[in-house]
Amino acid sequence: MMTPVFRVESAPLKTNRRQFLAQTAATTAALVSGCGGLRDPASSARVMTVRGLIPASELGITLPHEHVMLDFIGAEKAERSRYKRNEVFEAVLPYLENFRDFGGQTLVECTPAYIGRDVELLRKLSEASRLNLITNTGYYGAAGNKFLPRHAFRETADELAFHWLADWTGGIEETDIRPGFIKIGVDAGPLSEIHCKLVRAAARTHQRSGLVIAAHSGDGAAAMDELAVLSEEGIEKSAFIWVHAQNEKDVDLHLRAAEQGAWVEFDHVCSLTVDGHVTLVKRMKEHRLLHRVLISHDGRRVQANLRGNTPAVSVPHLHAGHCATRRPR
């Protein structure tokens, strides 16, 4: 029985670009899946990937927040016929192979339902690239609820949790592929009624599955509201990842979240943002909170760009130190 956590192990922080990016590549994040409220020793911790459970020790270098593909058409129009799975496979596989060639072993795929999540495609890519890919359950309410299915508005938090737990126990979309975490999205705080409901549903799913909650949070106020809801639900903050925390300008909120035990994720790392990310990470280190930090790129392939066969933002080349848009050699 175990509670899922990201474990971040890192050497002393370096401040120039090359060293910082090397540090990022060396960061190992372990997403431990299971159920209950007790952590297993690291030797027995396991992670749910699209190909099944693996020991956490096999994660290796991990990108904790990336996307293979996104479709921004909205929940009402989202359907598989909008893209050809084999074309996406051929376009994305070289980037995953490049990540593997430079030492990467695991990619946490954060695309939720109704925005382009395709778990069978992910399993095919995982098998071909020999990478561990981790998918999710949950709903994304950010962007003004555009990506929420109709039933999310009328159902209770418990009813939403029932759907997400069905993914965990029985598999996603009539497959045997199970989620390794919960992904939700909320707009800037204060939380709306429906976004509060999403957080409660995630908390109740976590209570019964142990899956960690990764929350796209519109700002720091939203993240603080989410943490308050988790407190009301009796959830340990170590089960919560504040996604896109770098967008919050009040850096004291980063400290407040981390001091409560939450994970603070600085993503969108690329050549244009690395200096600012260095500053954020240094501050967390100065406050002895580096162990609560996650770093990723939030790379993605946008479905609308598929015909051009060039990702809008690729899964980045870790060695290059920037968000590459060129194809791998």
Protein language model features and the residues they cover:
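Short acidic/histidine-rich active-site segments
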Residues: 214, 267-269, 290-310
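C-terminal segment of N-terminal export signals and the immediately downstream linker at the start
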Residues: 34-57
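N-terminal export leaders
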Residues: 16-32
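Divalent metal-coordination and catalytic microenvironments
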Residues: 65, 107, 206, 264, ...
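Histidine/acidic-residue-rich catalytic or RNA/ligand-binding cores of hydrolases
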Residues: 72-76, 119, 145, 222-229, ...
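Alpha-helical scaffold segments that flank or form the walls of functional sites
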Residues: 60-64, 74-132, 157-177
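Active-site gating/metal-coordination segments in enzymes
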Residues: 124-127, 132-212, 263, 268-271
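N-terminal secretory signal peptides
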Residues: 1-16
